[in-house]
C-alpha cells in the first residue's frame, strides 16, 4: 500500500520542513489538490508552488489532482513545474481521451477522476489511455465532508473494470478497512496524516492497517479512491 499525504493539510508556513519530514518518514508520494474557484468553490495553489516544492524534493512522486476547468490548457505548465502524474476530472474536460493521451505523451502518468454522481461507464472507452482512476467519495472542494457510503459499490465496480485499486482522503472509523478490502493500493490522507505527528509513526499505522485491514486500525478521513490500471508500472 502507498500512502499519499494531501498537501492541503500541511503547515504552509513551513512547507520545506514538511517535505523533509515526509521523506524522513519514508513517504514516497505527495498528493497536490489544485482548485480554481470555478470547477470547485475553493482556490488553492498552482504551478509556482509545485515548482518550489520540486526544487526541495527530487524524490517524492507528485500526484497532482486538477480540480479545474479546461485542464488541457495547463498540461505542459504542470509538467514543467514538476508533476509526475496529472489527474483530470471527467466532468471538466470535453475531450478526456485526447487530454489523457496528451498527458502521457508529455511523459507523465494520466489519471481520470469521477465525482460521486458521475457514471463510470466512459471507462470502457478511456481505460487504454489512463494509468489511474480517482473515485470521489465526497463532493470535491471542501475538506471534512461525510463519506458517501454508495462509494463502496462504485469502487468495486471500477475495480472490476480495471483490476486495480487505491484510496483517497477519509473521515470515519471503519472506512479504511472496507476500502482496503475492496482492493485499495494508494491511500490519500489529509488531516488524518498531517494532524497526527510524528509522521513516521502515522505512516506505520497506515501500513499496519493495510496489512491487517482492521476496522479500528486508524481514524482516517476518506474523500476519494484511486484505482490503478493493470499492466501499468506503479511508482513506489
Where are the regions that the model predicts?
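Conserved, mostly hydrophobic/aromatic
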Residues: 15, 22, 33, 78, ...
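Catalytic cores of alpha/beta
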Residues: 19, 72-80, 118-128, 171-187
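Glycine-rich, proline-tolerant flexible connector loops at the mouths of alpha/beta enzymes
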Residues: 31-47, 138-146
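C-terminal helical cap(s) of enzyme catalytic domains, especially alpha/beta-barrels
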Residues: 195-222, 226-231
Amino acid at each position: 500500500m502507498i500512502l499519499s499525504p494531501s498537501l492541503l493539510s500541511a503547515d504552509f508556513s513551513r512547507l520545506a520542513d514538511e517535505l523533509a519530514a515526509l521523506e524522513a518518514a519514508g513517504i514516497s508520494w505527495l498528493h497536490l489538490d489544485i482548485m480554481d474557484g470555478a470547477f470547485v468553490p475553493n482556490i488553492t495553489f498552482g504551478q509556482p508552488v509545485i515548482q518550489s516544492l520540486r526544487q526541495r524534493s527530487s524524490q517524492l512522486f507528485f500526484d497532482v489532482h486538477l480540480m479545474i476547468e479546461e485542464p488541457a490548457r495547463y498540461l505542459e505548465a504542470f509538467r514543467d513545474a514538476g508533476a509526475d502524474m496529472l489527474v483530470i476530472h471527467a466532468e471538466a474536460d470535453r475531450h478526456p481521451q485526447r487530454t489523457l493521451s496528451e498527458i502521457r505523451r508529455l511523459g507523465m502518468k494520466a489519471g481520470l477522476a469521477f465525482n460521486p454522481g458521475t457514471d463510470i461507464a466512459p471507462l470502457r472507452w478511456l481505460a487504454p489511455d489512463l494509468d489511474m482512476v480517482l473515485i470521489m467519495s465526497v463532493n470535491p472542494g471542501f475538506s471534512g465532508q461525510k463519506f458517501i457510503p454508495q462509494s463502496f459499490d462504485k469502487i468495486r465496480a471500477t475495480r472490476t473494470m480495471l483490476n486495480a485499486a487505491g484510496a483517497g482522503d477519509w473521515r470515519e472509523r471503519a472506512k479504511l478497512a472496507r476500502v482496503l478490502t475492496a482492493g485499495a493500493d494508494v491511500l490519500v490522507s489529509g488531516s488524518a496524516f498531517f494532524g497526527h505527528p510524528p509522521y513516521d509513526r502515522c505512516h506505520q499505522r497506515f501500513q499496519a492497517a493495510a496489512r491487517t485491514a482492521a476496522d479500528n486500525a486508524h481514524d482516517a478521513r476518506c474523500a476519494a479512491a484511486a484505482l490503478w490500471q493493470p499492466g501499468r508500472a506503479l511508482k513506489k
